[in-house]
Amino acid sequence: MAGSFAELAGRFGFRTDQGRIDAKTWREGTIFLGVPLAVLTLIWFFLAPFAQHDLAKTPFLAWGTVATFVYLLFYAFAILLIAICHYNLSAKRWRDRGWPFPGALAGLLPLTALVSGAAHWLQPREAEIISYWYVAGIDAALVAIIAWNVVEVGCFGARKP
């Protein structure tokens, strides 16, 4: 187990799911991953209107639209990298908690978050097919999983083997 979060982050401790960490290290690592995610998402909220491109009104190569999609490419890569790092961080913590199948439990939060993001993206484009209630249901599941993770791996200590 890493002695502190600084040691874990200093040797890039999110690169593998092997090992164990304590609740404090998990909380610090989650905040460490959550802050850039929040900043990148906030930037995307400001840039998202530029992704709407109507060729009847704007030229084919509108530089604002090109820059928006370049950022979207970077943002998508960052989202996937943060999800993988959080999976590795959580797998260590679930293993320390003594739950069976720590990899499956660690993957539940990133998977649900990615599905929620996809549903929020797809629903306005396919509103006739996908009701908003599906999106709300996925969001409710995401909130429940976040709450369960915060309580289970963020607050409780290690279980005795």
What positions do the PLM features span?
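Membrane-helix interface segments in multi-pass membrane proteins
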Residues: 39-80, 111-145
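Mid-length scaffold segments of soluble, non-membrane domains
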Residues: 79, 83-87
